[in-house]
Every structure is written in C-alpha cells, then in structure tokens.
Amino acid sequence: MPNIASASKRLRQNEVRNLYNRKIKSFLNTQKKKVIKAVDSNDKNLASEEFKKYASALDKAARKSVIHANRAAAKKSDMMKKINAMN
C-alpha cells in the first residue's frame, strides 16, 4: 500500500488506464481476426473493407497512446502485404 497520497492516486489512475488499454487492445485483436478471416476466404473486397476498419482502429489506438505509432504502422503494413498477396 502506498504511503504517499500521490502514489495512491497514481495507483488508481493506472488501474483505470489498464482497463481502458485492455479494452482497446482486445478490440484491435477482434478487428485483426476479421481481416485474417476475410483473407483466408479469398474475398478481396471484404478483406479491403475489414482492413479499413482495422487501420482506423490502429490509428486511433496510436493517437490515444495505447500502442506506439510505429507499431501501428508496422501492423498495417503487415496486413496490407497479406491482402496484396491474395490471388
């Protein structure tokens, strides 16, 4: 248990931020699974639509500092490579 008031406040803030970050990361994983499912089904139109949603979610997470901006860019790049490799 923290002895200093500011440490107690930081503990409370970290708990709230942890819940928020977990929620956002879970949403990102769900969006990623949707894109991968579309890629596996060889539906390029569906994959493109799902990718737009995924890219938007990644950008928002990066803007809110849930993930680093470079990490978001790398994830978008990897997913685009999978989509472009489709027949």
From Swiss-Prot:
GO BP, one annotated term: translation
Highest taxon in the source lineage: Bacteria
Assigned keywords, A-Z: Ribonucleoprotein, Ribosomal protein, RNA-binding, rRNA-binding
Gene Ontology cellular-component terms listed: cytosol; small ribosomal subunit
Biological function: Binds directly to 16S ribosomal RNA.
GO molecular function: small ribosomal subunit rRNA binding; structural constituent of ribosome
Upper classification of the organism: Bacteria, Pseudomonadati, Spirochaetota, Spirochaetia, Brachyspirales
The species this protein was found in: Brachyspira hyodysenteriae (strain ATCC 49526 / WA1)
Pfam families the UniProt entry points to: Ribosomal_S20p
UniProt family annotation: Belongs to the bacterial ribosomal protein bS20 family.
Name under which the protein is recorded: Small ribosomal subunit protein bS20
